[in-house]
């Protein structure tokens, strides 16, 4: 294992997991499993519809742990959490599937998605087209592409794999340079992560600085560091109506009630 940044270590481990996975399932196997899934729920469409209604488009995250905070929620029931989120106004769900660093699991995603009618984003570190078809095979409706973890060639390859698999894409950036790279793709939704994945430090100003550089016909989702109604108001006053929030909900006894209190 390398001694680089947290992101470097995650990607190195992910590449090992993919190599192991390919020995169990070929790309052909995953394509067949993906094609057997019911049609994906429209992740992008749900977000745009919420914003068109004048409401915040909340992607509510199901996350047990993180590298920087350790275990966030001991009492972890993804089905119960998913239902509470849906009942309290979430537009979409995000489910962590990385096991090594976030204590996630693909079974959590399957269980959560089967319990609700909301579109579900697979929150993981996608670096290989094999994972894109794996994502659809497990039932997810959208994937996350983290620009900091990918070359331009990888982004292009993964974006087109997602189109083939029938997945929507949330492209995540943290800097002006990453945003410029992301805009080379025909993306509709741009996630601006206020947390630097190399250091795990968080600044809400990251979204406020980068959002004006996103074309007006794109939807911006601010990610990480949203904890108070003042944070929400700050974003909405600046024309940002998409939110991805996890930790703020996961630390509360009732994550759904926490969502409602923060946004509605």
Locate the predicted segments by residue.
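Active-site beta-loop-alpha junctions enriched in small/polar residues
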Residues: 13, 61-65, 98, 125, ...
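C-terminal helical cap(s) of enzyme catalytic domains, especially alpha/beta-barrels
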Residues: 209-213, 236, 251-264
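An N-cap/entry alpha-helix motif that binds or orients negatively charged groups
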Residues: 2-73
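N-terminal active-site wall of soluble small-molecule enzyme domains
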Residues: 62, 69-170, 176-181, 207-210
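Conserved, mostly hydrophobic/aromatic
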Residues: 10, 60, 85, 93, ...
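Catalytic-face loop-and-helix region of soluble metabolic enzyme cores
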Residues: 189-245
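Catalytic cores of alpha/beta
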Residues: 127-138, 174-185, 222, 226-245, ...
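Glycine-rich phosphate-binding active-site loops on the catalytic face of alpha/beta enzymes
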Residues: 134-154, 191-200, 240-259
């Amino acid at each position: 294992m390398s001694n680089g940044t947290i992101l470097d270590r995650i990607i190195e481990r992910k590449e090992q997991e993919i190599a192991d996975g390919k020995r169990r399932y070929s790309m052909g196997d995953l394509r067949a499993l993906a094609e057997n899934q019911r049609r994906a729920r429209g992740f992008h469409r749900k977000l745009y519809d919420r914003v068109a209604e004048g409401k915040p488009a909340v992607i509510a995250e199901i996350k047990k742990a993180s590298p920087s905070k350790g275990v966030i929620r001991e009492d972890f029931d993804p089905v119960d959490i998913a239902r509470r989120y849906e009942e309290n106004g979430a537009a979409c769900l995000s489910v962590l599937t990385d096991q090594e660093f976030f204590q996630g699991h693909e079974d959590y995603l399957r269980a959560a998605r089967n319990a609700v009618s909301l579109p579900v984003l697979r929150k993981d570190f996608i670096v290989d087209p094999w994972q894109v078809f794996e994502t659809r095979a497990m039932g997810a409706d959208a994937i996350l592409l983290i620009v900091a973890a990918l070359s331009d060639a990888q982004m292009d390859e993964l974006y087109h794999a997602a189109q083939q698999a029938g997945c929507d894409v949330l492209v995540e950036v943290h800097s002006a340079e990453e945003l410029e790279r992301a805009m080379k793709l025909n993306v509709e939704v741009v996630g601006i992560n206020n947390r630097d994945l190399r250091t795990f430090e968080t600044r809400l100003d990251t979204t406020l600085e980068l959002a004006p550089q996103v074309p007006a016909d794109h939807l911006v989702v601010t990610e990480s560091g949203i904890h108070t109604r003042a944070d929400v108001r700050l974003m909405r006053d600046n024309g940002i109506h998409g939110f991805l929030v996890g930790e703020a909900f996961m630390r509360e006894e009732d994550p759904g009630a926490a969502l409602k209190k923060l946004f509605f």
